[in-house]
């Protein structure tokens, strides 16, 4: 499926490349960190500066997965959330959420300043805007809730956008940045401070050392042995709690458009009505970009993701003056049932294991706050957000109901070149894809996490699990967990 723009994130394209070695020789550390996004790197940085020995293992390249594909808004304004949190959790817990995200945002600003990081950091006002007049009351209620929590929130009659809106909630002095440039600099600070970072190192298992209290983190034939382990992998794959039923995977399409102006919009924006769009300016090496995210959808539940890109491009061209599409990508995140992340130490059999997950699309501030909490817990320090983010709190068992493959076809002949589909052969489902020449190749269609049948993503040419959000390349390699093993090869019928 031909789509405009280069596949990939503009943030990754406009950041220095990293070249940390592969982990090949066993090691010991105070803390092992699995995952090199904003949670893992922030945790490692905090612990390194506190005097801990830290080893961080990243399956691919640091920062390039979820964080490097976000809209990178540094804000405690998360659309319409505070009125809902006050109603469901009470004023004090809502206040803790507000304080945690404000704290995370200010920590980033402090790192940019203190480490002299060049990452396109800019202060911007944040707007949650309404397309429909019926949503004005919800915006007013959210502003009132935000003010109860200490935010200087106000309501404006129209968002500063080139299309009509029905009012907007405004938080002043929020921020935006290039998350990849920030994380590359954070990784450099960790490495220069004595921390160890390894890339292209997929962890196979995390378990207690036999007969001991230390943890063993296994990658290929080597181990990191550590007193504490932090699982910062978007969704935890190991530990006594099954987060795959406590979290729901969701994706967004994103497109970056070339524009003749650096200020097509001034601010960071998110719509409160469906279909919602997230809007901000950015840039790459060739100049300014307008970056827009489309509406969310559950991973693996759409058999035509390419259509979502076409619809998003149409919406942007209808509402903005832009040129060609420069970049396009899909990002994945996980939602929690109460809109609050899970972060901190797992109790009981998980003692000494820490997680950060379920950021509900707001991982820049929430992920940083989670890292601050985890680092405090490891150091034995009190943290006021501990009870709010508690990863062992109760959750409904049916929050994530999973789904079925959206790519079932009745014959290989129905699969076009550069496309994929799932066929059934001798009671076994096969994931079949064709290269440009039309040559077919086959894999097992069973996700290696729990066996759900995968869906072909015709935009990214990936196999996506509709149950728990694992993603695989067209030839079966793991991109996102919770799966840790590739799709099994299979013979064509």
Predicted regions and their residues:
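N-terminal Rossmann-like FAD-binding beta1-loop-alpha1 element of flavoenzymes
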Residues: 29-56
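Glycine-rich FAD pyrophosphate-binding loop
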Residues: 49-69
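Helical element adjacent to the flavin cofactor pocket in flavoenzyme catalytic cores
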Residues: 137, 144-147, 169-227
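Flavin-dependent oxidoreductases
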Residues: 205-282, 413, 422
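C-terminal catalytic lobe of FAD-dependent flavoproteins
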Residues: 273-274, 298-303, 307-399, 443
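Extreme N-terminal leader/targeting segments of oxidoreductases
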Residues: 1-31, 49, 477, 487-490
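Flavin (FAD/FMN) cofactor-binding and adjacent substrate-gating region
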Residues: 2-14, 80-86, 109-185
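Rieske [2Fe-2S] iron-sulfur-binding domain
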Residues: 255, 424-493
